[in-house]
């Protein structure tokens, strides 16, 4: 596959869970911006009913077609919204000093990344 060059030099953290319809809208915008570094954080399943959505979300974020450094933290257990917000940002900011933070229902315009 011929990879496109990154366009944005600010890392992006995407927090997601089991909502592929919402995540696909967010990820489409991120793909247009093509950040050079991407952090992917997913909370774990609460029960087996969450698994199809979790798998569908992982499939969406696996479709990276540009050059970027990708780090993934996919939790085995469910921490919930507030703890996941904290854990994901603590993880990302332990590696970088600035980062755009998006949740799976934050659909940015491409100009937001500039």
Outline where the language-model segments fall:
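Structural beta-sheet core signal
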Residues: 12-14, 40, 101
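Short beta-strand-to-loop acidic/aromatic patch adjacent to the donor-nucleotide binding site
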Residues: 96-107
């Amino acid at each position: 596959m011929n990879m496109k060059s990154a366009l944005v030099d600010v890392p992006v953290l995407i927090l997601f869970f089991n909502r592929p319809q919402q995540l696909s809208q967010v990820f489409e915008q991120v793909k247009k911006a093509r950040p050079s570094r991407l952090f992917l954080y997913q909370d774990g399943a609460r029960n087996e009913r969450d698994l199809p959505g979790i798998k569908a979300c992982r499939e969406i974020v696996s479709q990276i077609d540009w050059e970027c450094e990708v780090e993934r933290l996919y939790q085995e257990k469910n921490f919930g919204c507030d703890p996941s917000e904290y854990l994901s940002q603590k993880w990302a900011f332990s590696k970088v000093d600035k980062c755009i933070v998006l949740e799976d229902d934050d659909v940015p315009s491409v100009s937001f990344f500039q």
